[in-house]
Amino acid sequence: MPHSTAYVVTDRPERYIRQLVSHMGHKAETVLGGDGRAVIELRSGRCVLRPCPGGFEMIATAAAEEALLGVRDVVTRHLLRFATQEELVVDWSPPVGGDTAWALSPVVDDYLLTHCSPVDEVLRDLVVRTREETGGAAGMQVSHDEGALLTMLARMSGARLALEVGVFTGYSSICIARGLPPDGRLLACDVSREWTSIARNYWERAGVADRIDLRIGPALETLRALPAEPVVGFAFIDADKESYPDYYEEVVTRLTPGGLVVLDNVFLGGRVFDPAFQDEAQVAVRGLNETIARDSRVESVMLPVRDGVTIARRVG
């Protein structure tokens, strides 16, 4: 399901959200929460509004891109009618294709995110910067709830050496590094200097740059250069799907007893469920899902978090 976001700068976010809910109530189903968050549900799609420091965020979703553009237009036009005392700028991100098996109800999504540990200013700024710099590719960034899960799992694993295969702009790197002990180290693998150059600044701001060792180049080469023994306590795989089976094998053989490997996008937008989908990535991930379920070296669970997350724990 395609979606698009906009951040509106204002010192009166609650006022604008209340006005939108009140004014659009005659043509849409609206819900205003006690914490100032709101959902506007139109026939063509939905828009969730969330107060943030310095303004508010709008997240529009719809079944198709044309409908999404309509939702954005309706909400923007109504919002600007109220801006008589200041000039509001509503800059929507490009529509991001729905690479998830299903989209959560905005009410459920909003409730879920509200009841996770709150996102901080560094991660919030990184989300905005990623959207500005990468456009439609911003959909590759992990969500706040998934990032919170990574921090918790990394901390629970007790890992001193962690691996990340696929860095993008560094959001997940921050989350993992924050879960490591002070002497912990994250070996982060990616092939893009452009996207990881964004990451470095935010690693510094988050105070975790000294824990992250970025390796630019094919991840398989980096993994195979590691000692062929149990040295890794935590790993996160979120890179090219065609290579998932190879990444998993190189990682799992190096996991310490009790170590965790987490794999993102194991649903591939629901395409792994249907064997009619047979491109290289779909075949690779579908096959790996079966492999992990039967792998006696690990105990695993697959969770319906966003586009599917598998957590496997090394036994023995």
Q: What do these predicted regions represent?
A:
Residues 8-10, 60-63, 114-119, 314:
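Short beta-strand-to-loop capping motifs
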Residues 25-31, 37, 43-46, 50-63, ...:
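N-terminal intrinsically disordered, cationic/polar leader segments
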Residues 101-102, 116-120, 135-149, 155:
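Conserved SAM-binding loop and adjacent beta-strand
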Residues 60-99:
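C-terminal structural segments of small proteins and small subunits
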Residues 144-316:
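S-adenosylmethionine/decaboxylated-SAM
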